[in-house]
């Protein structure tokens, strides 16, 4: 009886722990897709393990855009334009982006722009927005002992979210039920990248790429993860979707790019049956 009870406890803990708190070699490959009706909230399609939390990575740029426009720090898809400064300490990739405006920030996923936005928001406003949005585990503390939550919490750090929670956030966004201004909705909607899928579907969404961490907390590049989350429209019909993929081998293709291309192919097919 004790063995059975222990087994049930282990299963429960495994199901509720975020992937970032589990060693990367303890997590199998994962692929989740959820599509829900934007009006009713009803799930139209769900497959895979969709309750596990992982880092949102750059898919967090969607809520960041809403925060930026609601706070007035961002004004439109083309304004403001911020110039890169050496003290921003950008990645080698992001050093090529010398001047960035909101639409370019979103389409090209420029990390230093995100970090400058949160720095301008400040800890208190940033934390308040995440809590009001009920976004994932709402933990923006950052890496343990580093006090870097304001600029790092969503980048393979403390903030985690599951595909199911992404859907709940997206449903609130498209229904205008987040505690933000109407202008924030309009500007965020206009800034998020749009893609054309088959069968006349217009897909709006943000990808996010990263990796799991190993037992020592180091990034394990053989465990890529990729998000693509957003909404899609066709002939007055609107759905929200979340796609999460976690692999078991190193890839030259960013995980978010792969998740995006997969959903652009699959969504029209899946919705054709609904």
From Swiss-Prot:
Signal peptide: 1-24
GO molecular function annotations of the record: beta-lactamase activity; penicillin binding
Alphabetical list of SUPFAM superfamilies matching this protein: beta-lactamase/transpeptidase-like
Pfam families assigned: Transpeptidase (PF00905)
Keyword Signal attached: yes
Modified residues (N6-carboxylysine): 61
Function, in words: Oxacillin-hydrolyzing beta-lactamase. Confers resistance to beta-lactam antibiotics but at a significantly lower level than the TEM bla gene product.
Name the UniProt record assigns to this protein: Beta-lactamase OXA-9
Originating species: Klebsiella pneumoniae
Gene name, Swiss-Prot/TrEMBL: bla
């Amino acid at each position: 009886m004790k063995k059975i009870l222990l087994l049930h406890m282990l299963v429960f803990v495994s199901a509720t722990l975020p992937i970032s708190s589990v060693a990367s070699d303890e997590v199998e490959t994962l692929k989740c897709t959820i599509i829900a009706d934007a009006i009713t909230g009803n799930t139209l399609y769900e497959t895979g393990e969709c309750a596990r939390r992982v880092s949102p990575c750059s898919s967090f740029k969607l809520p960041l855009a809403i925060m930026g426009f609601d706070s007035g720090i961002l004004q439109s898809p083309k304004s403001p334009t911020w110039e890169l400064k050496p003290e921003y300490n950008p990645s080698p990739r992001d050093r090529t982006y010398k001047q960035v405006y909101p639409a370019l920030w979103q389409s090209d996923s420029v990390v230093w722009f995100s970090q400058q936005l949160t720095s301008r928001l400040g800890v208190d406003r940033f934390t308040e927005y995440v809590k009001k949005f009920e976004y994932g585990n709402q933990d923006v503390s950052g890496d343990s002992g580093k006090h870097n939550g304001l600029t790092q919490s969503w980048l393979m750090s403390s903030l985690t979210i599951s595909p199911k929670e992404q859907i709940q956030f997206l449903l609130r966004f498209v229904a205008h039920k987040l505690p933000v201004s109407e202008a924030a909705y309009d500007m965020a909607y206009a800034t998020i990248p749009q893609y054309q899928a088959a069968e006349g579907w217009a897909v709006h969404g943000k990808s996010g790429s990263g990796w799991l961490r190993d037992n020592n907390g180091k990034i394990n590049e053989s465990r890529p993860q990729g998000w693509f989350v957003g909404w899609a429209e066709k002939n007055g019909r609107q759905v929200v979707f979340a796609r999460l993929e976690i692999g078991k081998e190193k890839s030259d293709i960013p995980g978010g790019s792969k998740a995006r291309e997969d959903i652009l192919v699959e969504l029209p097919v899946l919705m054709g049956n609904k």
